[in-house]
Amino acid sequence: MQQVPRPIYSTGLYAGAGELITITINDNTMGLTVIIGSHLDDLTDISPYLRLPVVTTSKQLFPGKNTIRNPLGGMIWIEKSKDVNGSADFVMEINGAYRSPDFIVGSTDVTAWVEQLRTTTVPWLELRGRHVAFSVQRERLLDMINDDPTIAEKMPNTLEAWDNAVETYYYNYYSLQVGAQDFSMRAPDFPERVVLDVELLDNLYIRNADYGVVALNTNYLLNELASYQTLKSGNSVAIFNALYRNYSFRDIKSPWWSEVSDAVKAIPLYRMAEKGLREDGYPMGPIFPEEGSSIAEQFPKALAYADTDSSRWFVSDIKSEVRPTYALASLVQLANYKDDDWAFYIELNRMIKDKISVDHSTSTYFFKALCDYFKEDFSPFFEHWGYSLTDEARSYASKYPLMDKAIWKYSPLAENPSSGVVDFPSNGYHYRHNRADWEIYALDANGSDNFNSGQSPDRLLDSDKSTGWTSYYNNDTSTPPLPYYLFIDMKETTDVNGVFLAGNNSDFAATKLIIETPVNQDIINDPLDENIVWREIVQIDSIAHPELPNIKSEGFYDFPSKEQVRYLRIKLPEPNRNDNWNETDMSRFRFRVQSFTEFGTFYYKP
């Protein structure tokens, strides 16, 4: 957690403006403080301000009689210090205060409460559950109830739903337990507080403070707190986001890589909305309001994307404004793999607690943890969603059998979400070789190094489709003549069933590749050695494979039969796909340039 809720007790009492409050402690207990006023923010730096900058008073309490007053009045809270000492069970008397019309889940009668709201003069109150305490303005709440009486009628359900949300989507999800002896695993002992205020620091409408969440006192935010339908339909967006900021791991321990990091923030809100859809029939809120579309609209599109047979590249295929929704769909699918019901995520969060840091520059940490948890290889799932995987991750996962369910067909909002999930056949799956130790050289027809600055051939082996190799070119005759060659040393003799290629969709896309290997696989010290006899394994061209010049993600090409090879040579003899270059224009020889982003080999398992 970023911030544990401060140990503040609600008293259900309110101090009148300027009126003397007497607090008597009939015990030798030390380490308590009384606070009058729930609006703890100091707005001195704001000018002009909408309320006085400091509106609370506080005072340490000692055994015996204590007095305090606040010229503006306010709720009465008691805060416990870390070094409090004395009896755990003692009597505290508070005199001179008014009873606040708080709603306390499990003990407040709705009818009597509404009547109290109408007759009391106390301006602020709390809505209290076991794990939440909301400080709200009586007048604004009463106006909302007058407009919609179900707000009051459903208040017990609303606070119970909030308690369940905090316990399930935050405590349990982050592997926290109420009363745990291990403090690293212990859920907060005090409720999550939300205080509505007329003005916030830094001109914000909501922020996380050391005593809870502070939000603007508006109908919109009060509705997020007090409306059962708003909560259960997943429309309490601001409050859920604030809670996520408090419970989520700091960036240094986050397991979430860039492709899904925005979606993760919405997991608690989505789970609440899905529950509301199932239990109450409420249409789900947009979850990502900034996208301008709903989950109900975008999820089917996301599932259709993942279910296609063509290769995918998530960050390139999906528009940035809807990526969070698409990514969320994939995370929900994983949560329900084999009816796991989010248990993997809970275990993941438990493991991270023991880590000093987590590398989330790629998906590798998350992917390995997922494979270890289910003892299955989830490469097909990542490929269907177009998520990048490193060779290291693929090699690690290959020790497990492939996942056996096509979970990318799971439809979260369907009446029977798993109805379309079928068995996933493992035969014919392309297992990719780990290229970590490979060496690669790019050469022109004259045997010279052949790559443009910053686009060396080793980028073909880095598992990153945003980088790649481009042969050298210039706007003059120094652009080298064809053919070009890529020479690869795999460092050991390897069973190979074919090759894959990615990112061959630029103006410089290759139109013909001839894959060759030496007749003799003895160690080669010089790939330019004229005594090496090369034999052709397969020829890949845009005539037999019309898709070749348009491959953005991976294209896979089988060898006629399995080969045992250590060395490969890729010969590029033809001009690129762009027919705008004119060879008679001697200042432009870019028709020769070749470029793609990934190259590797694959094999089949028996």
Annotate each predicted stretch with a short phrase.
Residues M1-P101:
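Beta-strand-enriched, solvent-exposed domains that form extended recognition/catalytic surfaces
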Residues G16-T22, P481-P483, K491-G498, A510, ...:
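Extended extracellular/luminal ectodomain segments enriched in beta-structured repeat modules
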Residues N28-L32, V84, T479, G503-T511:
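Extended, low-complexity, turn-rich repeat/linker tracts enriched in Gly/Pro/Ser/Thr and Asp/Glu
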Residues K82-R130, R577-P606:
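Exposed low-complexity, polar/acidic, P/S/T/G-rich flexible segments that act as propeptides
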Residues W113-E115, P123-N336:
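Catalytic cores of extracellular degradative/oxidative enzymes
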Residues F134, A296-R394:
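Active-site-proximal alpha-helical
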Residues D423-E492, N504-A509, F602-K605:
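Disordered, acidic Ser/Thr/Pro-rich linker "stalks" and the adjacent N-terminal cap
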Residues P481-P483, S506-P606:
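Trp- and acidic/polar-enriched beta-sheet ligand-binding modules for extracellular glycan
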